[in-house]
Amino acid sequence: MNEVFADAYQISGDTKYLDAAKRFSHKWLFESMRDGKDNLDNKHANTQVPKAVGYQRVAELSVQAKRSGDAVDYTRAAYFFWQTVTANRSLAFGGNSRREHFPDDADYLSYVDDREGPESCNTYNMLRLTEGLFRKDPKAAYADFYERALFNHILSTQHPVHGGYVYFTPARPAHYRVYSAPNEAMWCCVGTGMEN
């Protein structure tokens, strides 16, 4: 919601929408990320990632609205979220969850053991966050993550023959992927897959 209100501000120029974007920024996550504290253990991953996308949009538009304090805080929150997820909670191909949740930051074994590996929706939204951060500060680290996640996760999520989409990409040895059945399965990653 914070991203939607930030976009409404950009379209209208009315600061009430930027204020609403701030009010819809989940304080529990925002304050911890702003303060450099990773509290993502066992949290639903794709509930948190879009919040951080919104933080980045609020930061970007706060600069235009000449609200430098907001810009600094929201940039710090978005950047720390990106940094902790990409450095501490992502696999080599860019995926970052198992069973839709961030595991404990020291629980790497669950990535390999679990048949429900990283969700493509998370990676898609992390790419959206990466794009926003790159617009403000074009660092190579953003481009490196984007390339890795796009080529190794996102582009592999659509079935090459029937066009179905993948929900989870397991990291288990000798495991398989389940693709959606065209016109039948409409889970979240099918919709995100179409956006990819």
Predicted regions: what is each one?
Residues 1-196:
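Glycan-recognition and catalytic cores of secretory/periplasmic carbohydrate-active enzymes
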